[in-house]
């Protein structure tokens, strides 16, 4: 799955079919995004932070250290991971469903830590850091929860 969404687009839609059992190796999804709220099949998600690793831009974690990648874990199988080339955290406002994120050292979850990502993202954006490419790669087979369709919409 490959997709390009221009930064600053009034509205952009991306629908990705995520098979309930597994997805092929090396499937890639590329998006260019701006900070905002996204709508998924399981509810509304907030974009809390990412980095364009190709240009060297980074988002700092809550400890202040730069992160060049993270892992996304399925809510029904934390042992499986997706390698992420750029930072992304999607979480519903009520925090009832989210893609957990893993740094090089520890797992992050909960509203406070995720809010810190958003704060850092806005600070970096205000400082003029170019954040224009989000790229994450699915490696290997990955089991997903019941919502096998992920619909992302720029609002």
Which ranges hold each PLM region?
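Surface-exposed molecular-recognition determinants
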Residues: 1-155
């Amino acid at each position: 799955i490959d997709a390009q969404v221009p930064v600053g687009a009034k509205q952009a839609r991306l629908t990705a079919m995520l098979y309930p059992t597994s997805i092929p190796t090396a499937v890639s999804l590329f998006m260019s995004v701006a900070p905002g709220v996204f709508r998924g099949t399981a509810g509304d998600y907030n974009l809390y932070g990412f980095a364009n690793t190709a240009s060297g831009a980074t988002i700092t974690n809550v400890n202040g250290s730069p992160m060049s990648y993270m892992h996304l874990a399925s809510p029904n199988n934390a042992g499986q991971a997706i390698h992420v080339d750029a930072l992304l955290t999607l979480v519903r406002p009520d925090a009832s469903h989210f893609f957990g994120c893993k740094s090089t050292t520890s797992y992050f979850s909960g509203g406070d830590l995720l809010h810190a990502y958003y704060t850092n993202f806005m600070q970096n954006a205000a400082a003029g850091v170019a954040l224009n490419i989000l790229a994450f790669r699915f490696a290997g087979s990955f089991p997903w929860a019941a919502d096998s369709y992920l619909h992302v919409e720029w609002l």
